[in-house]
Amino acid sequence: MADPSEQPATAEETVRYANSNVKMRGAYLEGEMHGDWAWYRTDGSVMRTGQFDRGRQVGTWRTHDRSGRVVKETGFGEPAK
């Protein structure tokens, strides 16, 4: 079993609007955005979703309208190997 002290430091973050709805949510790995991230409108609807690989946008990012329908997709490079 790996020594826990050798594992990368991770942290999750959730930022909220004044009305307490979530504004953005995601995780950090060693201080860099990493993994799934999402941004929301003040009404709580999803605005944009995508992934980071150690601070770099990767994969398909999606922009959603207020009903949740995908209105735009943007592709970014794949994660570093």
Which residues are covered by each model-predicted region?
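Glycine/tyrosine- and acidic-biased, solvent-exposed loop/turn segments at the edges of beta-strands
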Residues: 1-81
